[in-house]
From Swiss-Prot:
Gene this protein is translated from: RB1
UniProt name for this protein: Retinoblastoma-associated protein
Cell compartment(s), UniProt: Nucleus; Cytoplasm
GO biological process: cell differentiation; cell morphogenesis involved in neuron differentiation; chromatin organization; negative regulation of cell growth; negative regulation of G1/S transition of mitotic cell cycle; neuron projection development; regulation of transcription by RNA polymerase II
Bias-annotated ranges (Polar residues): 612-634, 910-921
Species the sequence originates in: Gallus gallus
GO CC, any one term: nucleus
Assembly and oligomerization: Interacts with and sequesters the E2F1 transcription factor, thereby inhibiting E2F1 transcription. Interacts with SUV39H1, KMT5B and KMT5C. (Microbial infection) Interacts with, and is inhibited by fowl adenovirus 1 protein GAM-1.
CDD domains linked: CYCLIN_RB (cd20599)
Region spans: Disordered: 1-31, 603-634, 873-921
GO molecular function: RNA polymerase II transcription regulatory region sequence-specific DNA binding
């Protein structure tokens, strides 16, 4: 611990008010004289009001850090290192006597710099606990949301208010005061309405409510169009601008409830927000918030000091970020240069004066609104009741499932609404109900598609068994709701469609419906197959959910998976062999459906297969053998498919980590994979309440150990943290035995090695075990095809998926190189620019025609139009002609396009002549 100073060096250094409001505690005891650095540490602790327990442990943490390899970096940043140590210890001991902003101010660093330095400390020492990880993750998400919202707030206010309003406007209503009032009111509303403050969508909708409220209170002379006209109309009608000093705010709030919605409609239209959703937030959350404030207005605006004082109480209670400092552009809240380059930005409109327009990524708020719009487009034709087609399917069942389906949807709706309000905020219950209805619409839509698909596949109409399966319906509804929750749960830092964690993130929906992850997994692939309108981000999210289930969620103690494995062993009378290794290098078939997986019981060995199909759908486990009626019982389809997918995911994870660590030892990969695969297949109990990656890292370490390859666990962990979709809890908190957790190293020594010691030692002998085949790794079945697709109806039009204007290999914001193919692009729905671009196209076409010698057409009738191939020179030309060898591919393309256009025009002319002739007759 640091020795006690002769005098308290930092007692008067800071006058900040702590949440406790008391003086700092005494310095830790000691008798030696302080050095300069130690005195500064004590001064920092004094400034933060750190108690003795935090000071002592923080100093010990710093000493451990300073004694480690590469400690010179920390010696150069002593103060920052002390701050990180104090922060870590205060969280671990639950003795936070300072706010996060106070810590940043004391260290004179920004949020981004602090997080980056904390990450560096963790890389070298692994001293950051999962509790600290969780706190840091929450702070990051809150900061990202606040930063995105403040940037949006600034830009929006610039579009609403005049920079220099007329002189008749009171100085008290200056733009600075208005902005401050807006922002603090929003922060207070956000803090009081939302328990889950990293919800970007509801936060933005709440911001629009605040904007609507203040715009109506603003003099029209301050406003730009169309807000000026909207407020003027309200003023003329006498529905607003009534409050003055001393008038009760509750009356003002209630006065505005029934006013014209023109302003909120404009705001929603400008920001592509759903009007009904914003109104819902306004009336169920924002109005109750206003009524709870009891603030007296001054010139139509609440007193800033009163609002600020209320927010201060909230900020000190949470001990996190003082978001009022965004108004001052405080350095602690400014993103670093690197972080700025990674922020998404709104695409610019095409500028006719610019030669080339690069489309930049979107802002977080714009991206969130767009994903919601995409979901609404999918659900445009869907209803929250079963369609006539679904009812017909229900009526065809032996036992009509309609009543049970409707009752289930209603009861689960009440549960969802309650749990949503508990997670987000009690004032948001109606928002949860609104989102549940969207999920129900998607649920019925996908159910109908599934039944149509099964009907075509099996030529049956009676799906009684499937439609009366409670787990199937709950899983299907949960999957539909997960799509909705992921769409609305997009976070400010989520730019690539991947799933960023929030309180409502998967597997939240499983906990709400008390649904097992293994049961939910069964519906995912079929859900994606039968709903072609799902966006790429939605599909990637569901794929990530499937991966999480295979990695850990399906291996929880109460999972049905272990029952299936046990029954599989008993049925086959052998060691746990859910999937033979001989199938690993075979392609994974995707011809199964959700019905196959939900209706695939593990059959008793004594039963004979029946040749009569059951009502509902065919059961792949109940198909009779071609050679004998008494067939050997087959494995559960769901278990077999699950293991096939797990093996392929496991190998992909292993291969990625292996490439980072052991690329110079390629002979070790098949050995590590064999041990890894053997453990998953034959020692499945090691996976109980654990993670796939824990077994992977232990397998890698074990093989390197017996092969005398120097690879430390610390090195494995450091590389593992750089992999996508990883969590530090995976290696910091591993189950050792019941209710006891420790690090991955302890797990290896006490559990993994004890169980597999004999097997691992075989790899050091001259006769190692037979190597497991490398799994056949196909392209994900959920990926969209990148090949152009022809539009039906006979038009010679091809549509290719939008290519990203940036390549990660060239840097984050490095535009792709323009090619002849992409040099001039026309985006439907956007202004193409000046007529000069069309003239350039015509000129290029004319120039190419003068150099191209086309072969004569054999007949007047046009040939069938083939899909053009531009990749192989001189091959499969549209008209069968050959190009000159000196022509560029671009000229060839233009020639082919010209030829196609000529034939189409000729065909159109001939058709017109034929029509005229017929009319004359």
């Amino acid at each position: 611990m640091p020795p006690k100073p002769l005098r308290r060096a930092g007692a008067a250094r800071s006058q900040r008010t702590s949440p406790e409001g008391g003086a700092g505690t005494a310095s830790p005891p000691g008798g030696t004289r302080l050095e300069v650095g130690e005195a500064e540490f004590v001064a920092l602790c004094d400034a933060l009001k750190a108690p003795d327990s935090v000071r002592e442990k923080a100093w010990m943490t710093y000493q451990s850090l300073a004694a480690a390899d590469g400690a010179s970096a920390y010696n150069k940043k002593k103060k920052e290192t002390w701050g990180v140590c104090i922060f870590i210890v205060a969280i671990d001991l639950d003795e936070m006597t300072f706010t996060f902003t106070e810590l940043l101010k004391s260290l004179s660093i920004s949020v981004c710099t602090f997080f980056q330095f904390l990450k560096e400390v963790d890389v070298n020492m692994d001293t950051v606990s999962t509790k600290v990880d969780s706190t840091v993750s929450r702070l990051k998400k809150k900061y990202d949301v606040l930063l995105a919202l403040y940037h949006k707030f600034e830009r929006t206010c610039g579009l609403i208010y005049l920079e220099q309003p007329s002189s008749e406007i009171s100085a008290e209503l200056s733009s600075v005061l208005v902005l401050k009032n807006y922002w603090i009111t929003f922060l207070l509303a956000k803090g009081k309405v939302l328990q889950m403050e990293d919800d970007l969508v509801i936060s933005f909708q709440l911001l629009l409510c605040v904007l609507d409220y203040f715009i109506k209170l603003s003099p029209p002379a301050m406003l730009k169009e169309p807000y000026k006209s909207a407020v003027t109309a309200l003023t003329v009608n006498g529905s607003t601008r009534t409050p003055r000093r001393g008038q009760n705010r509750n009356a003002r709030a209630s006065k505005q409830i029934d006013t014209d919605t023109k302003v909120i409609e404009i705001l929603c239209k400008e920001h592509d927000c759903n009007l009904d959703e914003v109104k819902n937030v306004y009336f169920t959350s924002f109005i109750p918030f206003l009524n709870s404030l009891g603030v007296v207005a001054s010139n139509g605006l609440p007193e800033v000091d009163v609002l600020s004082k209320q927010y201060d109480e909230l900020y000190l209670k949470n001990k996190d970020i003082d978001a009022r400092l965004f108004l001052d552009h405080d350095e602690t809240l400014q993103p670093d240069v690197i972080a700025c380059s990674q922020l998404e930005r709104t695409p610019r409109k095409n500028n006719p004066d610019e030669e080339v327009n690069h489309v930049l990524p979107q802002t977080p708020v714009r991206a969130a609104m767009n994903t919601i719009q995409q979901l609404m487009m999918i659900l445009n034709s869907a209803t929250d009741k079963p369609s006539d087609t679904l009812i017909a399917y229900f009526n065809n069942c032996t036992v009509n499932p309609e009543d049970s389906i409707l009752k289930r949807v209603e009861s689960l709706g009440h549960i969802f609404k309650k749990k949503f309000a508990e997670a987000v905020g009690q004032g948001c219950a109606e928002i949860g109900s609104q989102r549940y209805q969207l999920g129900v619409r998607l649920y019925y839509r996908v159910m109908e598609s599934m039944l149509k698909s099964e009907e075509e596949r099996l030529s049956v109409h009676n799906f009684s068994k499937l439609l009366n399966d409670n787990i199937f319906h709950t899983s299907l509804l949960a999957c539909a709701l997960e799509i909705v929750m992921a769409t609305y749960g997009r976070t400010a830092s989520q730019s690539d469609g991947t799933s960023a964690e929030t309180d409502l993130s998967f597997p939240w929906i499983l906990n709400v419906f008390d649904l097992k992850a293994f049961d939910f997994y069964k519906v995912i692939e079929s859900f994606i197959k039968v709903e072609p309108s799902l966006t790429r981000d939605m599909i990637k999210h569901l794929e990530r959910c499937e991966h999480r289930i295979m990695e850990s969620l399906a291996w929880q103690s109460d999972s049905p998976l272990f029952d299936l494995i046990k029954q599989s062993k008993e049925r086959e009378g052998q060691t746990d062999q859910p999937e033979p290794t001989s199938t690993l290098n075979l392609p994974l078939q995707h011809n199964h459906t959700a019905a196959d997986l939900y209706l695939s019981p593990v059959r008793s060995p004594k039963k004979k297969a029946s040749g009569h199909p059951q009502s509902g759908t065919s059961n792949p486990d109940a198909q009779p053998s071609a050679t004998s009626q008494t067939q050997k019982p087959q494995k559960s389809t769901s278990l077999s498919l699950f293991y096939k997918k797990v093996f392929r995911l496991a190998y992909l994870r292993l291969h990625t980590l292996f490439f980072r660590l052991l690329s110079e030892h390629p002979d070790l990969e098949p050995l590590i994979w064999t041990l890894f695969q053997h453990t998953l297949q034959n020692e499945s109990e090691l996976m109980r309440d654990r993670h796939l990656d824990q077994i992977m890292m232990c397998s890698m370490y074990g093989i390197c150990k017996v092969k005398n390859v120097d690879l430390r666990f610390k090195t494995i962990v450091s590389a593992y943290k750089e992999l996508p979709n990883t969590n530090q809890e995976t290696f910091k908190r591993v189950l050792i035995r019941e209710e006891q957790y420790d690090s991955i190293i302890v797990f290896y020594n006490l559990v993994f090695m004890q169980k597999l010691k004999t097997n691992i030692l075989q790899y050091a002998s001259n006769r190692p075990p037979t190597l497991s085949p490398i799994p056949h790794i196909p392209r994900s079945p959920y990926q969209f095809s990148n090949s152009p697709r022809r539009v039906p109806a006979g038009n010679n039009i091809y549509i290719s998926p939008l290519k990203s204007p940036y390549k990660f290999s060239d840097g984050f914001h490095s535009p792709t190189k323009m090619t002849p193919r992409s040099r001039i692009l026309v985006s439907i729905g956007e202004t193409f620019g000046t007529s000069e671009k069309f003239q350039k196209i015509n000129q290029m076409v004319c120039n190419s025609e003068s150099h191209v010698k086309r072969s004569a057409e054999p007949s007047d009738a046009p040939k069938p139009l083939k899909r053009l191939r531009f990749d192989i020179e001189g091959q499969d030309e549209a008209d069968g002609g050959k190009h000159l060898p000196q022509e560029s591919k671009f000229q060839q393309k233009l020639a082919e396009m010209t030829s196609t256009r000529t034939r189409m025009q000729k065909q159109k002319l001939n058709d017109g002549n034929d029509t005229s002739a017929n009319e004359e007759k």
